[in-house]
């Protein structure tokens, strides 16, 4: 019998694939149905964000951060303003810190709702996204009421936040929490015990602790491997050290564990939100939301109508911006997808000399080859769904 040359089969996954999460293109090398190699092609959404930020003042560079992980925009802004505040050595008033923490946790819920429901959709369940997006819509309205924009907020500013929250909004956020937890339990009851969902996710995409550290995993990916590493606890920033919450960790480090962690993190985020709301309506009901340093934070409109100095400060801030002392800082926050870091180099002018953005999804996507090798073709979508990729931050 003649010898037959059996060669592997190459297939393109994306960039228009419904499960490709944006503009991802993966070249898969298959041996029958088994994945031998995965080659992610990135760069289809590259906009040169880091270079653009070097041509803008610090205040003008803020909105670029919203356009990275556009599922939870305020979490990215948080890292950038913390880096500027570290350079300038300024303190944010407690009420401003609480508002930031509140909206960071809203962002975490926005992200995890999208991820767990689309992860279920990737493996064939169509109901969860409809349920999840109903709650996301309510949270988007809170974004809109705080700053006027549903998505690209530009709400966190160096020194604090853009404007104070009306009391009615804080009350409405407090009233949102309990109904949200009820709907989360319904979603949990629908998806978690589902036989098909379990078969598609249990023991898929397993990663050991050593491998997770070596591949610079962070966020849910490292906690799924059983490491209680969360920057809100291990390197607390803002007022997270005053908040009570738990860090869920995984046992088997597979796709199912990562799903369960995200579900539990939403409950913990709701717990933090409740604490913020109680303090914003109680002990911290009044007080400034931004630093009172007029060289960094613009004055109120009412001041500008009666004070020449306020008008000058306002004009200088929005034309020239503020100057930072020369130096370099790295600040990381626990974004919903993992450790989002901003490395900022200042040369003493009103623009950053260099901005490096450390996106968690970038490191996770690099591990696609390692995670998927030896699995079936259908498992590639389950793994991709569980590592939570958004291309805005991967390509920057």
From Swiss-Prot:
Pfam family for this entry, one: Complex1_49kDa
Keyword Lipid metabolism attached: no
UniProt GO MF annotations: NAD binding; NADH:ubiquinone reductase (non-electrogenic) activity; quinone binding
Keyword NAD (UniProt): yes
Protein location: Cell inner membrane
Subunit structure: NDH-1 is composed of 14 different subunits. Subunits NuoB, C, D, E, F, and G constitute the peripheral sector of the complex.
EC assignment: 7.1.1.-
Topology with respect to the bilayer: Peripheral membrane protein
Role according to the record: NDH-1 shuttles electrons from NADH, via FMN and iron-sulfur (Fe-S) centers, to quinones in the respiratory chain. The immediate electron acceptor for the enzyme in this species is believed to be ubiquinone. Couples the redox reaction to proton translocation (for every two electrons transferred, four hydrogen ions are translocated across the cytoplasmic membrane), and thus conserves the redox energy in a proton gradient.
Major localisation: membrane
Protein's organism: Bartonella tribocorum (strain CIP 105476 / IBS 506)
UniProt family annotation: Belongs to the complex I 49 kDa subunit family.
Keywords on record: Cell inner membrane, Cell membrane, Membrane, NAD, Quinone, Translocase, Transport, Ubiquinone
Reaction(s) the record says it catalyses: a quinone + NADH + 5 H(+)(in) = a quinol + NAD(+) + 4 H(+)(out)
Protein name per UniProt: NADH-quinone oxidoreductase subunit D
GO cellular component: plasma membrane
